[in-house]
């Protein structure tokens, strides 16, 4: 199975989700510390050149591959990737199940503003504190989203491709 966490930029909640998924963060709903947030690999590190790139982060405890993608528009990238994977399944005997999990609903307003200041305007002195504030606000939701994503991945065995929009995790 392949898990692909995705959102607009691919560098904040997606990286938090990967860190939870790969047991690099405490496996609980407790609030993260500033150091834990800032030490998440790739957190606030990706640039616009990274949009649309599938980034491999490792294999989980069950041996499943975990990726992220900054997709800008969910209306284009995720459906295109879903159709590509279905084509590979049908025509070329590609045998991996794919779970796309959208982390965008977990993004709180401070994180949106922090991403804008830090990634777009390059004003880290304003952006990073807002990102940390936002990450602390949403970390429990991101943790629950990851747990849900894993459950769905294990339970939807008949589906080749699963797309989770995750609106129930809205911040």
Tell what function each PLM region has:
Residues 1-4, 12, 16-171:
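Non-transmembrane, aqueous-exposed alpha-helical and coiled segments at domain scale
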């Amino acid at each position: 199975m392949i898990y692909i966490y995705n959102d607009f930029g691919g560098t904040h909640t997606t990286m938090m989700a990967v860190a939870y998924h790969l047991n690099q963060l405490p496996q609980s709903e407790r609030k993260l510390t500033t150091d834990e947030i800032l030490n998440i690999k790739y957190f606030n590190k990706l640039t616009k050149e990274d949009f649309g790139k599938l980034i491999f982060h490792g294999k989980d405890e069950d041996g499943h591959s975990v990726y992220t993608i900054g997709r800008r528009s969910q209306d284009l990238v995720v459906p295109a990737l879903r159709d590509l994977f279905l084509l590979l399944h049908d025509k070329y005997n590609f045998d991996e199940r794919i779970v796309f999990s959208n982390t965008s609903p977990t993004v709180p307003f401070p994180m949106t503003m922090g991403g804008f200041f830090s990634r777009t305007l390059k004003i880290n002195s304003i952006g990073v504190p807002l990102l940390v504030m936002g990450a602390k606000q949403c970390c429990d939701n991101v943790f629950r989203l990851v747990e849900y994503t894993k459950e769905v991945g294990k339970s939807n065995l008949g589906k080749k491709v699963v797309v989770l929009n995750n609106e129930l995790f809205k911040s």
